Swiss-Prot record:
Lineage: Bacteria, Pseudomonadati, Pseudomonadota, Alphaproteobacteria, Rickettsiales
Protein name: Ribosomal RNA small subunit methyltransferase H
Keywords for the protein's UniProt record, in alphabetical order: Cytoplasm, Methyltransferase, rRNA processing, S-adenosyl-L-methionine, Transferase
UniProt cross-references to InterPro entries, sorted A to Z: RsmH, SAM-dep_MeTrfase_MraW_recog, SAM-dependent_MTases_sf
GO MF entry, a single one: rRNA (cytosine-N4-)-methyltransferase activity
A GO CC annotation given for this chain: cytoplasm
Keyword Methyltransferase among UniProt keywords: yes
Enzyme class: transferase
EC number per UniProt: 2.1.1.199
Function comment: Specifically methylates the N4 position of cytidine in position 1402 (C1402) of 16S rRNA.
């Protein structure tokens, strides 16, 4: 059964973003529109939404009908959005790095190990597909990708099984790949589906999700106004590490002049962020109980103190 999309950590996102009337916000990962709609409903503000998935355009049009000129949609990946946004700046920017239910639950999109469909996994429908990668990559490359992007300790065993299977038939469906992974490591009672980490790893690799995130963060200063807030919700340790390190590297640190003096801030325009969340925020147990996909989510936020 296809689930309706539930936005993860919605209230904590709104609290961190703190939308205000008359201000403009950028939703970098529109998906089903949960964040955009919540921001628009929070006050009389403006939202520009981005997504490289052409399948979300219909949903964007529905929101535009309800909110008129307060909402604008641009079909693009967020790393490549700077040229399309031109010189526009925003009072707040939010990124939800998870995959929406619209993608996971529709078999034809090829993301889900629960719904058999063509092995695709491409957000935009362009570039290398999961099928092409899985059937062409050597065992070492497969194992490296599954380990690096999926934290899968059985990556070599899975890669070996994939290569063995390819000798008899092409791996062209999500169902085939899921069964190959499951047969490699087996089910463990009470644990997540054995295919979870492998599917995550291949999806991240095929869509260059980490590279896109890094490229966006390098340039985000150019589109965030002074006092504007940057909120990122991640679902993978590598994503969270990238965001954490970016915030740390670009934030000012207090300098103690003496034990009697208060902390003072160095003035360095390259240190242009102030971290709002001292540590990553996690969803409540209640939210995870209602939406299991929220279990690995982490939210970090920072504010621009210089332009």
């Amino acid at each position: 059964m296809i689930q309706s999309h539930v936005s993860v950590m919605l209230n904590k996102m709104l609290e961190a973003l703190s939308p205000k009337a008359g201000e403009s916000y950028l939703d970098c990962t529109f998906g089903a529109g949960g964040y955009s709609k919540a921001i628009l409903e929070s006050c009389n503000c403006y939202v520009t939404a981005l997504d490289r998935d052409p399948n979300v355009i219909k949903r964007a049009e529905e929101i535009q009908q309800n909110y008129g000129e307060r909402f604008d949609f641009v079909e693009t990946n967020f790393a490549g959005s700077f040229a399309k946004l031109k010189e526009k700046k925003f009072d707040g920017i939010v990124l939800d790095l998870g995959v929406s239910s619209m993608q996971l639950d529709i078999a034809d999109r090829g993301f889900s190990f629960l719904h058999d469909g063509p092995l695709d996994m491409r957000m935009s429908g362009q570039g290398l597909s999961a099928e092409e990668f899985v059937n062409a990559a050597e065992a070492k490359e497969l194992a490296d990708v599954i380990y690096k992007y999926g934290d899968e300790s059985f990556s070599r065993r899975i890669a070996k099984r994939i290569v063995e299977y390819r000798k008899t038939a092409r791996i062209d469906s999500t169902g085939k790949l899921a069964e190959i992974v499951r047969s490699s490591i087996g089910f463990r009672k009470g644990k997540i589906d054995p295919a979870t980490k492998t599917f995550q790893a291949i999806r991240i690799y095929v869509n260059d999700e980490l590279g896109e995130l890094e490229q966006f963060l390098v340039n985000v200063k150019n589109i965030l106004k002074k006092d504007g807030r940057l909120v990122v919700v991640s679902f993978h340790s590598l994503e969270d590490r990238i965001v954490k390190n970016f915030f740390k590297e670009n934030s000012e640190k207090p300098v103690v002049r003496s034990k009697y003096a208060k902390d003072d801030m160095t003035i360095d325009p390259n240190k242009w962020l102030k971290i709002i969340t001292n540590k990553a925020l996690a969803p409540s147990d209640k939210e995870v109980g209602l939406n299991i996909r929220a279990r690995s989510a982490k939210l970090r936020a920072a504010k621009a103190i210089y332009e």
